[in-house]
Amino acid sequence: MAKEDVIEIEGKVVDTMPNAMFTVELENGHQVLATVSGKIRKNYIRILVGDRVTVELSPYDLTRGRITYRFK
């Protein structure tokens, strides 16, 4: 999938799940299941409940996403 096809939106981590999965509440009120992107995993960036994050969503499945950035 091309990089231009993704939808980027900010949200807040609500819950943590096994296998580096998180429930993220988006700005518009929807909740999505998000995984951690490879660069965040590689650099050992910790994501905790309450963190503000940027999530990439595919236009084909708006219920799952990828966390690409954690705000400080």
UniProtKB/Swiss-Prot annotation:
It comes from the Bacteria. Keywords: Cytoplasm, Initiation factor, Protein biosynthesis, RNA-binding, rRNA-binding. Residues 1-72 form the S1-like domain. Gene3D superfamilies: Nucleic acid-binding proteins. Its main location: cytoplasm. It is found in: Cytoplasm. Pfam families: eIF-1a (PF01176). One of its GO terms (molecular function) is ribosome binding. One of its GO terms (cellular component) is cytosol. Component of the 30S ribosomal translation pre-initiation complex which assembles on the 30S ribosome in the order IF-2 and IF-3, IF-1 and N-formylmethionyl-tRNA(fMet); mRNA recruitment can occur at any time during PIC assembly. Belongs to the IF-1 family. One of the essential components for the initiation of protein synthesis. Stabilizes the binding of IF-2 and IF-3 on the 30S subunit to which N-formylmethionyl-tRNA(fMet) subsequently binds. Helps modulate mRNA selection, yielding the 30S pre-initiation complex (PIC). Upon addition of the 50S ribosomal subunit IF-1, IF-2 and IF-3 are released leaving the mature 70S translation initiation complex. This is Translation initiation factor IF-1.
